[in-house]
Amino acid sequence: MEEHLNRLVDHIDGALGAALLNADGVVVHAVEPGKNLRLTHGLSEFGLVAKQLTSLDELSDLGEPLSFKFDSSDRTLLLRPLGPKYFVALWIKATHDALRAQFQLRIVSADLMALV
């Protein structure tokens, strides 16, 4: 698991960290190269929001969500469901390419799904 999260962070310019969390928002494993950022704090709240958003599929005709993007002035958080019980999260600096990060997140998500 750590290998896949490290690969994700290593392949993205401006990556600040990556994490695997369960559907209740609990961080199962995190990789933060700049450990002083403490990115995992508050991540549980994003996990709970993502869980609620994935339930929209049951209430509407939107279809199953594939990913979520939360932007702030200094960073972007990307979340991608790994089935009904897990999410993978990736933080990048706001000034970097979120589309490339989403692409890499999709690739690594396939590998992580085999582990969870």
Where are these regions (language model features)?
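Non-catalytic interaction/Regulatory regions outside core domains
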Residues: M1-G17, L21-A23, V27-V116
